[in-house]
Amino acid sequence: VTAELALALPVLLAVTAGLAWLLAVAVGQIRTLDAARETARALARGDDAAAALALGEQVAPPGTRLSISRSGDRVVVRARGRIRGPGGLFGAIPGATLRADAVALTEPGADGPREADR
């Protein structure tokens, strides 16, 4: 039993580390989507573009870029980021790209946002 455990334990640790990294990627993707949504909602309400971007950056993972564009009465927010690979034994695995887009209709009476990038 000891020899089998000695062989299985490193495999279990590697699988656990890989699953933890996949969970981190999933959480990063959710945060990226939330950042795009929060920014789009704020702009649809008529908030200033700088304030809306600041709100989105509070939610986004570090290093995420938010960009705003407007098409008629629609506000489009794109969030792009990257999460590092797991490193260590998994050094060959590249990082993951995080992407999210959110579209919102400008509310009646709200000033439209200006083009902005951050």
Task: Describe these PLM feature segments.
Residues 1-52:
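Alpha-helical assembly-interface signal, strongest on the long, hydrophobic N-terminal helix that forms
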